[in-house]
Amino acid sequence: MTAEYKNWQEEFVDINFTDQRLKSRFFKIIDAFAASPGKSTWAATGSRSSAKAAYRFFSNSEISKDELLDSISRATVEKIKCADAEWILAVQDTTAVGFGDRKAIQGMGYYCSTEQRGMLVHSCIAVTDQGIPLGIIYQETNTREKPRDDSQTKEQKRSRPIEEKENFRWLDSMRETLLRMPADIPILTVCDREGDFYEFFSEAADLKADFLIRIVQNRMVDDGKKIFHELRSSPVAGSMVVRMSRNPKEHIPSRNIKMDYHCKKVTIYRPQRRKEKHLREKLELTAIYVHECGKKGTEWFLLTTVTVKSEKEIEKLVQCYAHRWKIERFHFILKSGGKIEKNQAREYGRLSFLTLLYSVIAMQ
């Protein structure tokens, strides 16, 4: 057995194949895909017979995507148990995977407001509070039956039940994370601005789940003022240097940024349009405002359930949010290295399965 073969086995815990030949074939396929990322199944496997064997494997109902995900998640839990970390960050994000106008993909719908075919891939990965990626906790894919409807007003969109909105996947991912992770492991869910909705905050409180979210909504807080104004006008609590990861999309290299931060306890309230009884009327949270020193540049407004008692604890939370860029890097590698958008599979379910498979490779 090669070292590579053994290592890939460690990424799938208790994967259940009744036929050991299928298990052997599975790891050979993983090994081939990892050695030739972005190539077609035919090119990666190296021969006509190997390619046919791979196609037969993907057509076999022996192992489902859900079973594969459970196995991957269990492997991540094993790594988490060995990690030296105060918190494990459960970092969520969504990326769009487009297939252009390839209408021949069975079951594939739309992913944006145009006629372009594609799917949305929502992932949750485990990262230590020191920024070390550990593995995939959860992943789901969705494709729209129709192109996104941009004709609705903001108020129409806001009034829809959360279960009918696409950002429901952020709630779903948090629930799945808590189900999959051992209860004695401290989890901090980290989200970008798409996770900024009251239903998420309220359910996290019900589940006693900690979160750290960059907010975009300038909410009213307990003293009748807007949260952004309150944070900007509050005294500077301290300064710190934040390591910003490189942004390959905008060709920005990694760099250190000196930032000031402000911190304030706030109370936010259930939106008036939300009448659901299960939503909490108000929530007491910690708000943090971080911005570049002396100039207009990078700034973050953060909300968290974590109570802070010192500057050191504030700085730790800011660094934890900075680690959110690990998932953007992960999605970038999945799409640019794995070239999943160029995969020639002709069925949505298979592309979803392959995306999860390539996600494990991308994490490495």
Write out the residue ranges for each language-model feature.
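Single, function-defining residue in the core of a domain
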Residues: 1-105, 113-120, 125-364
